[in-house]
Each structure stands twice: as structure tokens, then as C-alpha cells.
Amino acid sequence: MEAVVNKFLKYISFDTKSNEDSNAHPSTEGQMVLAKELARELKEMGMIDVSVDSKAYVMATLPANTENHVPTIGFIAHMDTAPDMSGKDVKPQFVENYDGKDIILNKEKNIVLKVKDFPEIKDYIGKTLITTDGTTLLGADDKAGVAEIMTAMEHLINHPEIKHGTVKIAFTPDEEIGAGADYFDVEKFNADFAYTVDGGTVGELEYENFNAAGVKLTIHGRNVHPGSAKDKMINSITVGNELHSMLPENEVPEHTEGYEGFYHIVAFNGTVEETKMQYIIRDFDRKKFEERKATMQKVVDTLNSKYGEGTVELQMNDQYYNMKEKVEPVHHIVDTAFKAIEEVGLVPKVVPIRGGTDGARLSFMGLPTPNLFTGGHNFHGKFEFIPTFAMSKAVDVILKIIELYSK
């Protein structure tokens, strides 16, 4: 346990917050700094073919030490932390032998991790938790994944008696801004399949994610002096409100769960003359996903018929798809991970990802990639925490998957 925790504490000291407004790759310099450090550590521990490219993708190989015909397995995690909150000067706090009560993160600022807000924390009574000090996020998403993969590789190198096939590892930049797979060289990586280590609760295994589209709307109004505006003015803000009201009221993130999809308005800025709106559309079912996009198009067409052609301009683009259709043909990769989770003494929880991962994109690039847990909770904010035992269990699962395939 100590090794994975120490690595995690080291990696969260690097500020690697990604920036969605940047056109650079990686989007922030801190990611390249961490990439170079990881490459240095990989070389030092004895991995081969260690590389960091100009976009900060780190790749390395652990060569096989068995004559058996064993598939080449990849493990992938991302180095960046979410833009939602600062990841600079993270001050982790240890809560040992957690007693099931509220945790004071920052007395001075009265920031408290409350059981009533996050009841799942009671699952960890008696365990050691790592929390924030309430002023930053923690960075378990996904530096816990990085630390877990690094620890597993170090263990295999230090224990050559454990037989294994070729293992490939990669650490990616900019996952949090949706660009983690943009420059991922699948051919160079050269694995038969892979796993991202980027999930949440201990025991989780994910191989289904949303189909996703992004929507940008520009509404053109007609501004006329309000004193003489009757039958002349078109207020673009009002049209925007009308557009929003034409979408299903309850099919939004705050009223959906499990396999339910949604429309989510993420930006709405306007004047009488011009309003800009942004939505994301999400659904697990491809048919329902296409129907949601058609609904958005129909709403726009209706408003253009009412207010005049070109009043509402629509840009809609698909962002990623449900990896399930690419993972199903090689379902053994899910079955093996499920078995590995069981064999290390956990109860596997197969859950749909209400979001996307690098693995979703990679699966459509020819590298089927389900997602394994890191053990963390409440990612992207000051209430993020991770139980230390969950991190060592994640290491155990990585090692167990490799072991099961080497038999």
C-alpha cells in the first residue's frame, strides 16, 4: 500500500490542470513536466521503449517473460486534472481509522465533508482516507490511476518470477477537456486491447458510456426601440427561452440517472440582437441518441418557420460514441476484469459511465478499452477523496488481469 500512496502523493504535487481555451497540445505546460518525470521513473524501474512525444503522450513496454502465447495488454491513465478547480499546491490530508462522522477539511474556511451530502463515505468506516484541505481538488482523477499502473509495473519488474505477457502502458494529456485520444498513436502502442484506470468506486468496471453530441446555437434578433417595437422586434433572448422550453422538461442531468439520457444546457448568453446557447446531448442507446438530435433539429426548424429562416443557426457535432459496440465482440476483456475483481476479494460493480473516457474514443480507433476503478470519489472538486486500501486493490486488479491472461 505504501508504494502506491507515495507515488500518488508525489504526482498530485504537479499542477497539471488542463485548459479548454488553449490551442496548444498539451493544453498546459505542467502536463509535459509530469510526462517527463514519469518517463524518467519508467526508465529507472526498467521499462523499455519509453517515450514522451511532443504532445506529452508517455508510452512504455514491459516485455514478456513467458514463452506462452499471451495477448499484449495495455493500461492507460491520464495526467491532467479537471479545469473545474485548481490543482495547484494540493495539500492532502490523511483521515486514519475514519469514524463515520463529518470530516472538517478546512476549519478556517468552514469547509466540511458532510455525511448527509456524501453518504457513501460511511462505507469506509475504519479505513484511511486521503482528502483535500478544501482549497483545491485532490487529483485522484486520474493521478490515482497513474500511481496504480506505475506501482503494478514496478511490482512485476521486482518480481520476475511472476510470469506475464507483454504489457504496454500509456499516460495521456488533456482527457478532461475531451482531447485525451486526439493524438494517441494506436499503431505505436501496439496492444491487442487495453484498460483505462480512470473509474470511481472500488470494484467498479465500466464498458458502456454515453453517445455524445455538442450543440452550438446562434439566435439572431431584431432590435428596435422598445417604444415602437410592436410587431417589429425579435428579442433573441426570448427566442432562446422559447427554444429551451420546447425540449423535454425532465430530460436533464438533474432528473436522470442510470441509462437515462438528457439534454443539458451549458451556456446561455445574449442580448436582444444576438444570443448564443450551448447544449450537450447524451444517450446510451444509439437510436435514442439520433432521435434526440432530430428533436433539436425539429425545434430549430419550427422556430425558423415562426421567426424567419436563419433566425436560429444550429451547429451540431458528434463527440464520441458508446464503446459497448466495440467491446462486445471481445467480451472476454470484460469477463477477465470481472473475474480479477472477484479474485482480489471485491464485489464487481458493472455500471454505465454517465460520461466519456479516453477508452470510448480509443475503442473506435481500433483499441477496445473498458474502464477500471481507481477508488476515488467526488472528482473535480474540493470534496474529492480516496481510501488508501482502494488504491492497493486497484493495483491488485491490474496484476490479476495480467496473471489471468498469462495462464
Swiss-Prot record:
Reactions catalysed, as given in the entry: Release of the N-terminal residue from a tripeptide
Protein keywords: Aminopeptidase, Cytoplasm, Hydrolase, Metal-binding, Metalloprotease, Protease, Zinc
Claim: DNA repair is one of the keywords in the record: no
Cellular compartments annotated: Cytoplasm
Cofactor note: Binds 2 Zn(2+) ions per subunit.
Biological processes annotated in GO: peptide catabolic process; proteolysis
Positions annotated to bind Zn(2+) 1: 78, 141, 198
Signal peptide: none
A Pfam family matched in the record: Peptidase_M20
An example Gene Ontology CC term for this record: cytosol
Listed NCBIfam families: peptidase-T, PRK05469.1, PRK13381.1
Function: Cleaves the N-terminal amino acid of tripeptides.
Family membership: Belongs to the peptidase M20B family.
Protein name: Peptidase T
